[in-house]
Amino acid sequence: MDIRQDDHIVIIGNALADRMQHHGWLESYLQQELRGFDLVIRNHGFSGDRVDHRPRSVGFPSDDEYLALSRADVIFAMFGYNESFFDNSEGFAEGLTQWIDSTQAKTYTGEGPPRIVLFSPIAFENLGSPDFPDGSQHNTRLASYTAAMQAVATEKKVEFVDLFHSTKAAFDSSDTAYTINGVHLNSDGNRLVAGFIAESVLGWTPDSSGKNLASIREAVQDKNWHWFNRYRATDGNDVWGGRSLLSFTNGQTNYDVLHHELEQLDYLTANRDRVIWAAARGRTTQADDSNVPPAVEVETNLGEEQLQGGESKTGSILYATPEESMAAMTLAEGLEVNLFASEEMFPELVNPVQVGVDTRGRLWAATWATYPKWEPMKEMDDRLLILPDENRDGVADTVITFAKVHNPTGFEFWNGGVIVASVPNLLFLKDTDGDDVADVRIEIMGGLGSADTHHSANGFAYGPDGYIYYQRGTFNLSNVETPWTNNQESDLSGLYRFNPRTHEFSFHTENQPNAHGTSFDYWGYHYATDATGGRAYQIIPNDEGGFNKRRLLDHTVRPVPGSDVISSSHLPPALEGNFVILNVIAFLGAKNYELQYDTRTGFVNGVEREDLLVSSDLNFRPADLDIGDDGALYVADWANAIIGHMQHNVRDPSRDHEHGRIYRITASGRPLSEPANVYGRPIPELLELLEDPINGVRKRA
C-alpha cells in the first residue's frame, strides 16, 4: 500500500477499531517496520459506529472536524459488524459507497483527498462456550458483508483488506482464544489482527519479536492514553456541550478552561509521537513537555451564597478533622460511630464514591481524586483501594492500591476480580499472583456514556439474576456492542443491566434526570433513587415484558447520591430490611424508611422512621454505604466544600482533592456479626451460604 514519509493515518470504525488503541499492537508493528517514516497515527474508533450512523453526545465535534484536526492523509476504515445484524448487505454497500464519495471530495490536509483503506469485519470466533453464540449465523452474514465491501472497494478503486477470512482461518485452526466474547478481540487477538493488517499494508510479515517492539509499544500506549483523553474527553457536556458556556467568576466558562486543556493534550500527544519514533530507531527518551502551555487559572466562586431551603449548599475550605466531624453527628438511638479510615491515616483515600465488601470481608473503596476528571500535566490518581481490618478492631490497618482507574464511578465484585466503570469503558480487573494488585485488565465493554461524569454509570449492584445493575443520568449517550445483537444506542437516563458471563446488555427502565443508587432486598424486590429530585422508586414488571417504576416513599430531601437496604444481624432488629437514602445538601445524612409489603399486589411502600444519621458539618457528604461482614454500617464521606457539578467551574480550586473518610456505625451493646468467611470455601458450603438470611453473605457466596 502507499504509505509515505510523515503520513498521518487515522483509524475509524466500530469497537474493532476502538479497542485496538488500548493494546497498541497495530501502531507498534507499523512504527517498527517503517522506522524513519515518522508516522502519526490517531485512533478515532467508537463503539457502536456504523458507516452511515455515528451518534455522539451534544456538541461533540463532527467526524470531519476531527479528521481535519488529525490531518488525515490515510484513513483505515473498519465497519460492517454492527450493520451485519440488519442482514442487508446491499444497503450497507450503498452507505459505504456514499461515504467514500463524500470523503474523497474533501481534504483534511490541504493537499488532496485522503487515501482510503477498507477493512472487512473480523470473523466471529466460536469459543465453545454455552455463554456465547457459536457464531455460525454471524459468520454467514459477515461473509456477505465482506463480499459487499470488497465489491465496493473494487468499484471505487480503494484498497481493501479481507480480515474476515484470515481471522476465520486463524480462529478455526487454533486453541487460543482471541476474543473475550466471540467478537471483541483480547490482546492476543489484537496482536494477531495487527499482524494481518501490517502484512497487508507493508507487503511483508512484521517482526513479532523485534528487539525494540516492547519499548515502541510502551511509548504507543502512553501516547494513546493522552490522545484518548483528548478525543474521547470525558465530561464532554462541559467541554463542548450544553454546560460548556456556563459562566462563573469574572465571566470565565468551562469552555475557556477545558478547550485549553484540549490544546494541552494536543501538545502532550504530539510530544509522545517523538518518543515512539525514537524507540523505533532504538533510542530511549522521555517526552519533553516543556512546550505545553500552562493551565488556565481559575478563581473560585465558593464565597457566593448558594442556598437550598435556607441552608447553604456549599461548605468551608476549613475542614473539620474526622473526630470533629463525628462530634457533629447525631445518630439514631442505640447507634454509635467510629472512624474506620481517613485521609489522615491514608492519603490515598480521597473522594470515596462507592464502597463494597469482598469475599474476604475486606472493605474496598473507589476514590476519585481527579473529580470531575483527570487534568493534563497532573497525576492521574483515581484508585480502587482495599482497606483491610486485620485485627478486627473496626479500624482499617493499612491501604492497598488494587489499581488506578480513571473516573471509577462504580464497581462490583465478580469472578475473583472486580468490574469497574471507567467511562466510556467497563473494565474487568483481577489479581492472579496474590499481591492484591491487579495484573489483569480487560476492557469488557465500551460505549458507555461519558458526557457528564458525575452521573455516568454508577451504584453498581449485583442482582439476583446474575446481572450487574447500574444507573446513569442525563446528557450521556451510550452505544454498546454485544455478541448478541446490533449496537444498542441510548440517551435515556435510568437503569441498565449487564451480564458479565454472557455479555448481554440492556436498558432496564427510565429514571430521570440524574439516576443514582440501586439496591435489592431479601425478597429480590428492586429499588432505585434519583439524585436530583431525591425520589425513590420500586422497580416493577409491566405487562409488556419490561419494567416500570412506582413511587416508593414521600421524599423530603435532595440530592441523593446513593441508597441501600439494611441487612445485618448486628444492627437493631428495628432497622432490619429498612431502606436508607443518603443526602448531601441541606440535610446531610441518612434517611431511614421501614419497608411495608402488600403481599396481594407485590407493592412495597416506605414509611419514614427516625433519621439514621444527620450531621451539622457542612463538608460532610455521604456518598455511599454498605454493610460489612461484621454487620456494621460503613458510610463513605466525599468530604468536600463543593458538591455541585454545574454550580462551579469544573476546575474551581475549591474542589477538594485531599479529603475522604469512611465511618463505621455500630449498635451499642449488641454483638458484631460473625464473619461468614466466603473466600476459598468449597462449592457445597457456598451453596449452604445461599440460604443465609443476610443479603451481603448470599451475594458474596
Identify the residue ranges that each predicted region occupies.
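Conserved catalytic region of serine esterases and O-acyltransferases that act on ester linkages
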Residues: R4, Q21, A177-I317
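A short helix->loop->beta-strand "cap" motif at the edges of active sites that frequently abuts
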Residues: Q104-R115
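Substrate-gating cap/lid alpha-helix
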Residues: N126-L163
